[in-house]
């Protein structure tokens, strides 16, 4: 075969060959196939490079030898005609062309086409990426076949119908050697495409340029579910590799659609080897082009099967067949023997291509569609056997089918990876059902575990379900990649700690991942390259798919909740019944405490266990016998439920022995034990119980009751026995034979009774030792005084309980007392300190026994006192309770006033501890003597000096002593006015006694004798000391004199003299002299010169002072300044001074000076008020009289803008000054003005202030341009306050206060607050405030006017453009399908309602409960909905609802009755205002024709077969119409007939009456929806049985109706007797009347019953609502009394509202930055208004930190931001949210950086917290989190800078530290920089209101919730009262006499009807009213509440015509 494919077939190329292109020419090969006699071979034609189509055609004609006039076409092998347009593009070197009569001509004989299939360079590039290999015990052969199926799937992807792929295993030896054929009905391949297929590694992406096929380049398919795009033939490798993996040779046969030719290519290993041997081109060959079903070239017997295969080509439009021969023997055996296995594997690989995106859901029938139209069929042909044919669609045990059909629920998700990478995923849950796992087993992964004896709960072993298999199988473009699986993701992996569900639930999930082609797979499609790595990348985004829509949510939380729901709903093992409630179990760990559902019974393994039932446990230590208390099941359950586990609470039995409750797993109940066995065990255990104690004292020291004992007396050892009632000793409680019983212990307690309570001082527990009894050792430690109790108590071993099962265990009590012993030691009591030398003191003693108890001294004892260095003696010692050593006196030296420490030893002979050391501090005694130094009696001093005396105060032991008020005085005698010296020796006892100098006046040369007396006035007992003083004259300075030396003559300047001198001159030659007390001149020494001071100069030349010279004096420049000159001398003895005054005189004229008398301001246009005074002054400004009247003419005045016309200049004679008046300026800018005054050579300048003139106009401050209209939203405030400024006529601000300002506006424009008069302030401004504007849409004007001095000042006109409010609803927009028809009883089309604002935009975020739909039947004059109009609520929003802010009314039932109905939609704006839509009028049309009915029910005829026509008349004037199921007339367009037939009650009865004319049927025409039955008469002497009921069946026969219409049946009575017929006719008439009356009665009673049921439902619902709200109020500690509820609620509500209003009125921090107008919903507002902060310090620092962003306006869209930008000319900052990169935004739940992996890395101080966590958002929380997350990032706030620095220093050790702020206002930037003004927040007042506001108090929010609840409760209470009142009224109405009478009448009429029917002989069938017969069945539950829709439909169907029921 291989040789044939490569050789020259049938001589087709005889005489031809390929020489290739020569010298730029192209070689073309031509086949002439115009007729049968054409040449078989091809012709080679050389085509010039520059040839055109005409020349080429001429060359063809010449080469073939045909006329150029002959008609023919030249085509490619793909039948593409060569024309002048495509010649250059198509005719290339080596191309094969056909000569045909027409393009679609059949190929009469086969041709060959030369091809090259040199492998693509990717062969080397990707050579290492491909090989088939076995994995995990799997044979790779199915995967090789899958490669061929991939190609077929791609080929059939464009099929509109069935995509058929056949794999034929041709193993019948009679037909040739084994072969495998893969055939599909795809689009086939052209010869060029077949050539491309042969090129190795030519993938679909590289088929460009030279490899370009007939089709365009690769186009990626559109996304489809599960990526089932059939785009899986990818790399140009798999098909060829698969072929040569299966066999040695491949034959490719293909026919493209719309092609006349079949293309065939053979590749074989043998042919390749032959070409290599012959040195031929290996990668070249021929494609055979032939007509379909032509197998003439198949001559090899080994390939006989090809004839049949080729024969099948006739029936195919397009196909491709891959025939593999030379199949490996091992492959043949595998394909034969393991057919089911590898077909199952193929089904697994292509599961979703075969069954569609949902997979093989066996329970769901599927129609052929785009996702399940693939048939893959496997055929096995063997010799002598019937062919086996398997369709993969029929295989039901592939793993995906098992996964899908054993799963109870699924969790769908989607992952987005690296842009376009999309992975769809599904997780399925396989529940545990009753006794086994339902997770399917995979033969490749056996996971069944051996049964193990589980000692725990009913949980199965952890890996029992899925085992070790990974969760996810992976599909690429919908096709399984078998060797790649993903174990799990972080969010679906079993948690390390127990979560919401048991851990085994994670092993009950399977899953599948479906990727698109953005993920790389190996070229053999066995493995993914990096799927798991990409999916587990941190940037991969997982979303959940709900209802086909992606939803962004936390995938881990959603999965955990889904898994919990699956576990609770689908896992079933134990049935829990008799639900009791939900509890928490505080005895368990916190995470497991609740919720727990409690039940009273379970059903398990066919048995029922109930509360109270006796049970026994197994596998517990010990075994438990007891009664069931209840069952626990973890979770929030309600009602009966199945679960896999649970616990049972058991009360141990007998309870007298085991007063204990145990909880064990349900699995540990013994299901085999009999109940009588448990009861016998309980009875046996009740016998043995302890009764009393036996106490003995084996070692003596017995304790007697009520004994009094000295402290320390021992209590002897105790021996105790526990005796039962039989007197038997026992050591333990009786226990079961199956477990350890509880030991008994004896507890001994000694209790001391004190005033503060009982105190347990001894507590011992003794246990029985087996060989020795209960024993307590001797007790010798009872030493405290008081009353005692010794108690012996039997207790339990573990719990130490003294009761068991409610009974006290035996005990024994002995009471006794303890008193003090004899004295053994002593201590000192509280001493009265201080201790002083020679002063007696007492020493109190406290005597104690050996245990420290206080006792008394009874015997005579002489104390001994000893102390080193002291002499001691005492008076005596007292006995009795208070022992004191009295009158102790100590004497001796103590060295200092602070005293000295001594150890005083006290000895009491005769005591056990007879001595104690008392540490005392002995202080000096009281003053006794005064010592004065110097010791000399006569002392000599100089006058004016002080004398110091050294004084000491000593006690009797010569110790210097001190005491309070110890003051020593020294008085001098012998002269007047002598000082007195005092010194305080209170602290030290010694000091220097001195004082003021002794100064005696007029002591010149003689000395003076004085006496000094020194004494202590406070101590009269201390003798005074006297000294004699001799006083000499002083040698210190006593006099200072000043002289002025002029011309060698010194003139004395006396003290306080005045000296006149020329202003500004200097006084020189001043000298001074000093004299002492003896009038002796003192020589000035440098030391004395240092002490001389002058006041007119700070620096004095010391050398001049030594010479007696004083500094020069500078005379003041102003004659008004008088200078005071002072000279002083001061030393330690004296202070001398001498002073004089210098008065200046004026100098010569020098300057001209001007002075303004009056105000400096000049009002524009007015003269200067006041005058200007001009004077002449000297150089220092002193005025000089120089002016004269003649000299005034030379005075000139100039200035900028000065108006000199009114100047007045006058001379003031008295002051010698010039007065200037009449200063005025020309109008100009206000400001300072300079005036220049000039006289002779002198000039001066004067500045005045030019101010604005009188007010004449008004201007607006800080207001936009008035040329443009200002936009403002209706009902909103203006952006800026209205501030008015008064101005003069030249537009200068006029500072005039109290000018009245008012606004002039149109009446249609309303300003709030209302128009009030305002007055200007001191600056001429008036702030009218910020107005709220309400006006119609459009432009309005407002004018400002003022009143000044009774004249009007016109102000500017403000133009306002009123914009609609985007948040104010004005109308409802209703959308629905207006072309829809409304059929009675059907479902309305969907209504989509949106609330439209004034601006025309849709208002979003509206509570759906505020939207309602009302419907009522339209009647004349009714425009408003009636009270009984039906009301509907809107439906929940679905996932695919695109429009936000829209409300949907879906599936609302159309009324049953036809007519015009009105639909109106209402929006509740608030409690009083409702906005209604335009009414929608709908015409309800009748439904489908269903039955034939009469217009009015005729009476039951009674006829006979007599001659009289009246007696034979059945019907007279009967009109029959077609109606639908609801009684609406329909079928007006129907045409046909109504056939009347008489039938008997028995179908077999043939003796039925006949119509007139002896016919059985009559036909009546049916037109325009009805048939008129004018007269229907029986035939005379008609057959029929007497007194028999017959029926006339009126059957409609209408040609245009599909289906059968219900016929109308009219009963009638037939009689043979005329008289009887007349009687029966009367009875029939009466029967009809009774039937009608009964029907109306029943309708009445049924309607009343339904009304009562509905009222009961409403009452119960109202009661439940009231109870629910009452409980919610209790949570807020609000109790509602049982009586006077309404009064209490109203008072409580008023109180809460008052409290809330008071809280809201409290002042709190506000942001005063003006917000931006929210003219649309896309504007959120300025950042400063979006958040609030409670803490003032945090608000200050965060506001400062964001200061540059606070006035930025945040918008949702860039368009809205751009609009604001344009409106404000770019002045306003804007921030659109749709431009924020959200991946870098912080996670608001992220912990602070000092937490690492959930652990505290270091302990911070300063209360760190993320700044963003301090923000609260009143609105738009999600958007605000985005904004502030971007602005603040991870900024942290702490208390102070120290805390912040410490925090940063620690954080940077582990991670990056964000910006830190402190509550003190400091900032540390993220780079660590802090300090400076730019990092320090200013005070709050400096932020100018640009600060975040404070939220309302939390209590205000709580009050708001309480008020809302109270209002709801008030409404619910009113509702409950109203409903109960209506129900009571209705029940009373049902028991009224009138209703009882009607009930009685109904009973009587039914009895009468029954009698009449019996008389008539009619079948007693109750024919109820038609509407009642078809009323829906309503399920009866515990609460008789039908569903809302059922009630509505039932109410409609039971409507009856108005009118009274006949009485």
UniProtKB/Swiss-Prot annotation:
Protein induction: Expression is repressed by CDX2.
SUPFAM superfamilies: ATPase domain of HSP90 chaperone/DNA topoisomerase II/histidine kinase (SSF55874), Smc hinge domain (SSF75553)
Chain positions found as Phosphothreonine: 1500
A GO cellular component entry from the record: Barr body
Cross-link for Glycyl lysine isopeptide (Lys-Gly) (interchain with G-Cter in SUMO2), residue positions: 1375
GO biological process: chromosome organization; double-strand break repair; inactivation of paternal X chromosome by genomic imprinting; negative regulation of double-strand break repair via homologous recombination; nose development; positive regulation of DNA repair; positive regulation of double-strand break repair via nonhomologous end joining
Tissues expressing this chain: During embryogenesis, specifically expressed in immature olfactory sensory neurons.
Catalytic activity: ATP + H2O = ADP + phosphate + H(+)
N6-succinyllysine, modified sites: 1803
UniProt keyword Ubl conjugation, yes or no: yes
Subunit structure: Homodimer; homodimerizes via its SMC hinge domain. Interacts with LRIF1.
Family designation: Belongs to the SMC family. Highly divergent.
Domain notes per entry: Atypical member of the structural maintenance of chromosomes (SMC) protein family. Like other members of the SMC family, has ATPase activity, which is probably necessary for its engagement with chromatin, and a SMC hinge domain. However, the SMC hinge domain adopts an unconventional homodimeric arrangement augmented by an intermolecular coiled coil formed between the two monomers.
Name of the protein this chain belongs to: Structural maintenance of chromosomes flexible hinge domain-containing protein 1
Gene: Smchd1
């Amino acid at each position: 075969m291989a040789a044939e494919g490569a050789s020259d077939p049938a001589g087709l190329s005889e005489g031809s060959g390929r020489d290739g292109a020569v010298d730029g020419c192209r070689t073309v090969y031509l086949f002439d196939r115009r007729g049968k006699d054409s040449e078989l071979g091809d012709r080679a034609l050389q085509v010039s490079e520059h040839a055109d189509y005409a020349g080429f055609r001429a060359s063809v004609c010449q080469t073939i030898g045909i006329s150029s006039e002959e008609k023919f076409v030249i085509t490619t092998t793909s039948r593409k005609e060569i024309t002048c347009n495509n010649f250059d593009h198509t005719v290339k070197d080596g191309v094969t062309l056909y000569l045909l009569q027409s393009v679609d001509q059949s190929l009469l004989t086969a041709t060959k086409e030369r091809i090259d299939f040199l492998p693509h360079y990717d062969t080397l590039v990707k050579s290492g990426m491909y090989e088939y290999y076995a994995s995990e015990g799997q044979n790779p052969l199915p995967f090789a076949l899958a490669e061929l199926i991939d190609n077929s799937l791609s080929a059939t992807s464009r099929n509109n119908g069935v995509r058929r792929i056949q794999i034929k295993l041709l193993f019948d030896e009679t037909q040739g050697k084994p072969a495998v054929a893969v055939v599909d009905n795809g689009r086939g391949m052209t010869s060029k495409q077949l050539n491309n297929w042969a090129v190795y590694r030519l993938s679909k992406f590289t088929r460009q340029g030279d490899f370009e096929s007939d089709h365009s380049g690769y186009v990626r398919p559109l996304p489809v579910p599960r990526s089932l795009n059939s785009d899986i033939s990818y790399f140009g490798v798999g098909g060829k590799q698969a072929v040569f993996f299966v066999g040695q040779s491949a034959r490719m046969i293909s026919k493209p659609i719309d092609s006349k030719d079949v293309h065939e290519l053979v590749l074989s290993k043998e042919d390749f080897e032959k070409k290599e041997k012959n040195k031929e081109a290996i990668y070249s060959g021929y494609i055979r082009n032939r007509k379909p079903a032509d197998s003439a070239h198949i001559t090899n017997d080994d390939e006989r099967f090809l004839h049949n295969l080729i024969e099948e080509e006739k029936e195919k439009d397009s196909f491709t067949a891959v025939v593999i021969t030379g199949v490996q023997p091992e492959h043949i055996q595998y394909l034969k023997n393991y057919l089911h296995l590898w077909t199952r594997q193929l089904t697994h690989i292509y599961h979703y291509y075969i069954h569609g995106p949902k997979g093989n859901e066996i329970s769901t029938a599927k129609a052929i569609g785009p996702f399940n139209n693939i048939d893959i069929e496997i055929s096995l042909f063997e010799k002598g056997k019937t062919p086996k044919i398997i369709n993969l669609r029929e295989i039901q045990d592939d793993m995906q089918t098992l996964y899908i059909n054993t799963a109870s629920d699924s969790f769908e998700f989607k992952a987005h990876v690296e842009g376009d990478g999309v992975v769809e995923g599904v997780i399925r849950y396989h529940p545990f059902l009753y006794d086994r796992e339902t997770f399917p087993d995979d033969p490749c992964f056996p996971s069944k575990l051996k049964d193990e004896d589980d000692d725990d709960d009913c949980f199965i072993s952890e890996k029992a379900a899925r085992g070790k298999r990974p969760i996810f199988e992976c599909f690429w473009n919908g096709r399984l990649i078998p060797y790649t699986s993903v174990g799990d993701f972080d969010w679906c992996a079993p948690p390390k700690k127990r979560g919401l569900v048991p851990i085994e639930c994670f092993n009950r999930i399977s899953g599948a991942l479906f990727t698109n082609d953005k993920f790389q797979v190996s070229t053999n499609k066995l493995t993914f390259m990096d799927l798991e790595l990409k999916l587990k990348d941190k940037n991969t985004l997982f979303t959940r798919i709900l209802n086909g829509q992606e939803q962004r949510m936390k995938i881990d939380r959603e999965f955990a909740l889904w898994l919990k729901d699956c576990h609770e709903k689908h896992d079933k093992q134990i049935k829990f019944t008799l639900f009791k409630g939900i509890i928490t179990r505080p005895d368990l760990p916190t995470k497991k405490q609740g919720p727990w559902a409690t039940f009273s019974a379970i059903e398990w393994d066919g048995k029922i266990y109930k509360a109270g039932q006796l049970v026994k446990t197994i596998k517990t230590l010990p075994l438990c016998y007891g009664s069931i208390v209840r069952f626990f099941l973890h979770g929030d359950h309600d009602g009966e439920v199945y679960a896999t586990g649970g616990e049972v609470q058991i009360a141990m039995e007998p309870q007298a022995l085991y007063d204990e409750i145990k909880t064990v797993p349900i699995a540990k109940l013994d299901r085999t034990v009999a109940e009588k066995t448990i009861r016998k065990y309980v009875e046996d255990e009740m016998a043995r119980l302890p009764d009393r104690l036996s106490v003995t004292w084996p070692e003596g020291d017995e304790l007697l009751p009520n004994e009094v004992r000295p402290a320390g007396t021992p209590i002897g050892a105790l021996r105790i026995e526990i005796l039962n009632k039989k007197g038997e000793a026992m050591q333990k409680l009786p226990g079961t034979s199956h477990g350890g019983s509880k030991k008994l212990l004896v507890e001994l307690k000694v209790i001391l009774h004190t005033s503060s309570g009982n105190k347990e001082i001894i507590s011992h527990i003794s246990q029985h030792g087996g060989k020795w009894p209960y024993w307590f050792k001797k007790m010798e430690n009872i030493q405290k005084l008081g009353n005692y109790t010794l108690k012996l108590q039997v207790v339990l071993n573990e719990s130490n309980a003294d009761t068991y099962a409610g009974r006290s265990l035996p005990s024994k009590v002995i009471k006794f007392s303890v008193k003090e012993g004899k004295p053994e030691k002593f201590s000192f009591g509280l001493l009265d300190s201080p201790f002083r030398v020679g002063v007696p003191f007492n020493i109190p003693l406290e005597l104690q026994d050996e245990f420290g108890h206080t006792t008394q001294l009874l015997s005579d004892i002489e104390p001994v006192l000893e102390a080193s260095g002291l002499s001691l003696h005492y008076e005596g010692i007292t006995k009795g309770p208070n022992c004191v050593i009295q009158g102790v006196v100590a004497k001796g030296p103590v060295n200092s006033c602070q005293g000295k420490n001594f150890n005083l030893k006290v000895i009491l002979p005769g005591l056990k501890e007879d001595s104690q050391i008392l540490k005392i501090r002995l202080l000096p005694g009281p003053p006794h003597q005064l010592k004065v130094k110097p010791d000399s009696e006569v002392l000599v001093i100089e006058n004016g000096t002080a004398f110091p005396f050294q004084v000491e105060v000593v006690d009797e032991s010569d110790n210097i002593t001190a005491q309070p008020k110890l003051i020593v005085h020294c008085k001098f005698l012998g002269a007047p006015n002598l000082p007195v010296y005092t010194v305080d020796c209170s602290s030290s006892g010694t000091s220097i006694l001195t004082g003021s100098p002794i100064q005696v006046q007029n002591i010149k040369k003689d000395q003076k004798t004085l006496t000094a007396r020194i004494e202590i006035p406070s101590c009269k007992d201390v003798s005074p000391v006297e000294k004699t003083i001799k006083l000499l004259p002083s040698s210190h300075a006593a006099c200072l004199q000043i002289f002025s030396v002029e011309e060698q003559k010194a003139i004395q300047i006396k003290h306080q003299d005045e000296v006149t001198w020329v202003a500004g001159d200097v006084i020189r030659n001043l000298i001074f002299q000093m004299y002492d007390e003896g009038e002796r001149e003192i020589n000035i020494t440098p030391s004395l010169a240092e002490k001389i001071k002058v006041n007119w100069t700070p620096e004095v030349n010391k050398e001049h002072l030594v010479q007696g010279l004083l500094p020069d004096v500078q005379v003041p420049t102003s004659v008004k300044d008088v200078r005071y000159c002072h000279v002083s001398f001061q030393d330690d003895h004296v202070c001398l001074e001498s002073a004089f005054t210098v008065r200046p005189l004026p100098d010569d004229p020098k300057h001209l000076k001007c002075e303004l008398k009056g105000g400096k301001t000049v009002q524009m246009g007015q003269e200067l008020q006041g005058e200007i005074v001009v004077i002449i002054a000297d150089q220092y400004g002193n005025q000089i009289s120089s002016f004269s009247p003649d000299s005034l003419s030379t005075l000139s005045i100039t200035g900028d803008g000065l108006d000199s016309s009114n100047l007045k200049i006058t001379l003031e004679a008295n002051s010698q000054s010039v007065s200037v008046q009449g200063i005025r300026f020309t109008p100009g800018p206000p400001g300072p003005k300079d005036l220049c005054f000039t006289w002779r050579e002198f000039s001066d300048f004067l500045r005045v202030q030019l101010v604005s003139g009188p007010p004449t106009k008004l201007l607006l401050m800080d207001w936009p341009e008035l040329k443009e209209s200002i936009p403002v939203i209706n009902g909103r405030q203006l952006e800026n306050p209205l501030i008015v400024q008064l101005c003069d006529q030249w537009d200068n601000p006029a500072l005039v206060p109290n000018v009245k300002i008012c606004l002039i506006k149109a009446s249609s424009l309303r300003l709030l607050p209302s128009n009030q008069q305002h007055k200007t302030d001191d600056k001429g401004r008036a702030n009218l405030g910020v107005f709220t504007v309400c006006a119609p849409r459009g432009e309005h004007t407002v004018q400002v006017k003022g009143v000044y001095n009774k004249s009007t000042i016109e102000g500017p006109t403000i133009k306002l453009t009123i914009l609609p409010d985007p948040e104010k609803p004005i109308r409802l927009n209703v959308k629905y399908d207006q072309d829809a028809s409304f059929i009675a009883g059907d479902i309305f089309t969907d209504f989509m309602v949106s609330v439209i604002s004034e601006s025309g935009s849709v208002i979003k975020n509206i509570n759906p409960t505020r939207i309602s739909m009302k419907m009522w039947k339209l009647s004349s004059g009714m425009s408003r909905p009636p009270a009984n109009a039906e009301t509907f609520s809107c439906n929940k929003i679905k996932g695919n609802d695109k429009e936000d802010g829209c409300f949907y009314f879906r599936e609302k039932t159309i009324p049953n009755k036809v007519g015009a109905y009105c639909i109106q939609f209402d929006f509740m704006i608030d409690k009083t205002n409702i906005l209604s839509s335009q009414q929608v009028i709908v015409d309800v049309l009748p439904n489908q024709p269903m039955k034939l009915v009469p217009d009015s029910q005729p009476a039951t005829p009674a006829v006979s077969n007599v001659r009289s026509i009246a007696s034979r008349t059945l019907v007279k004037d009967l009109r029959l119409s077609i109606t639908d199921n609801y009684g609406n007339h329909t079928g007006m367009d129907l045409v046909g007939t109504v056939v009347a037939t008489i039938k008997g009650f028995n179908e077999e009865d043939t003796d039925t009456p006949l119509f007139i004319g002896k016919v059985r049927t009559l036909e009546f025409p049916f037109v325009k929806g009805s048939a008129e039955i004018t007269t229907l008469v029986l035939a005379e002497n008609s057959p029929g049985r007497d007194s028999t009921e017959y029926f006339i069946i009126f059957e409609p026969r209408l040609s245009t109706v599909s289906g059968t219409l219900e016929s109308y049946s009219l009963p009638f009575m037939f009689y043979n007797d005329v008289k009887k017929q007349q009687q029966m006719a009367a009875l029939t008439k009466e029967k009809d009347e009774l039937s009608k009356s009964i029907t109306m009665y029943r309708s009445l009673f049924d309607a009343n019953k339904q009304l009562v049921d509905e009222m009961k439902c409403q009452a119960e619902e109202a009661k439940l609502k009231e109870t629910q709200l009452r409980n919610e109020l209790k949570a807020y500690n609000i109790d509602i009394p049982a009586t006077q509820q309404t009064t209490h609620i109203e008072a409580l509500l008023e109180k809460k509202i008052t409290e809330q209003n008071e809280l809201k009125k409290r002042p709190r921090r506000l942001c005063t930055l003006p917000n931006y107008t929210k003219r649309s919903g896309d504007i959120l507002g300025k950042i400063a208004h979006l958040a609030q902060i409670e803490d003032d310090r945090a608000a200050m620092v965060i506001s400062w930190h964001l200061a540059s962003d606070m006035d930025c306006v945040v918008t949702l869209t860039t368009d809205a931001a751009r609009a604001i930008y344009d409106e404000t000319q770019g002045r306003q900052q804007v921030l659109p949210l749709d431009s924020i990169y959200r991946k870098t935004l912080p996670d608001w739940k992220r912990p602070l950086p000092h937490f690492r992996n959930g652990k505290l890395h270091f302990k911070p101080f300063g209360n760190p917290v993320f700044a963003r966590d301090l923000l609260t958002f009143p609105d738009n929380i999600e958007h605000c989190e985005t904004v502030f997350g971007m602005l603040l990032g991870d900024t942290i706030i702490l208390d102070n800078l120290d805390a912040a620095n410490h925090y940063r220093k620690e954080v940077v050790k582990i991670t990056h530290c964000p910006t830190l702020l402190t509550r003190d206002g400091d900032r540390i930037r993220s780079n660590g920089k802090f300090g400076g003004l730019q990092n320090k927040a200013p005070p709050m007042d400096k932020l100018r209101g640009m600060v975040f506001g404070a939220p309302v108090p939390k209590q205000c929010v709580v009050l708001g919730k309480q008020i809302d609840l109270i209002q709801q409760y008030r409404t619910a209470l009113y509702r409950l009262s109203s409903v109960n009142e209506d129900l009571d009224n209705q029940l009373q109405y049902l028991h009224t006499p009138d209703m009882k009478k009607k009930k009685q009448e109904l009973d009587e009429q039914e009895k009468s009807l029954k009698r009449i029917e019996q008389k008539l002989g009619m079948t007693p069938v109750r024919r109820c009213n038609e509407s009642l017969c078809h009323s829906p069945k309503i399920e009866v539950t515990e609460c008789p509440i039908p569903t809302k829709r059922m009630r509505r439909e039932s109410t409609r169907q039971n409507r009856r015509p108005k009118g009274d029921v006949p009485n």
